[in-house]
């Protein structure tokens, strides 16, 4: 299993990325908001983020995915995306405890306004998204040098969130310090789990198979260059 620390700066998060997470989409906010975002990004610039990743053999069935002998009840939509995969990267990534601590300090500061707190939360969401992309790039560069899917996670498109537990168990139970609640929510909150299949027939993101077409956080696929 590969467990790594990733400096915040390596994620190359921009003010535009955070504005997108807030809901501005392709439009930028006014200069005052951009300055606030920029200042808060500096608050988090020294934190360390983390991921753990392992590769397992597996197979895809019509409504489920089997990884290292463990069956995930992914449902038809996710299984269809992963058709053709014989190996799976399973990962958990997190913004980490340092991020949570700084957010708590911001919330407890009586001078902090609600917008600043909202932006700080959006920065955490952006960290999680960027870590997912970082893991995919790591796979592309060094581990699985061929075509593979984007990451998909329990909770996507009728895949029961309870499958978080067996996913975490594949990575030792509490990978990179992330733990699950009884309701299968992750803590630290700004964390991401997922699977990535090799040799898939199509490359889509979770948003591509989600029926919530009017979600303000919806994104189109961002494909990595295929390697053959």
Each model region followed by its residue ranges:
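Conserved active-site and cofactor/substrate-binding residues in soluble primary-metabolism enzymes
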Residues: 32, 126, 130, 205
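Short terminal or interdomain "cap/linker" segment that borders an active site or interface and mediates
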Residues: 146-219
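Generic secondary-structure signature for well-ordered alpha-helical cores
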Residues: 42, 46, 140, 144, ...
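Internal, well-folded beta-alpha domain core
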Residues: 113-171
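A near-ubiquitous, low-amplitude feature marking generic local secondary-structure context
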Residues: 24, 74, 106, 110, ...
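Short cysteine/histidine-rich zinc-coordinating motifs and their immediately flanking basic loops
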Residues: 219-228
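Active-site helix-to-loop segments that bind/position phosphate- or nucleotide-bearing substrates
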Residues: 1-116
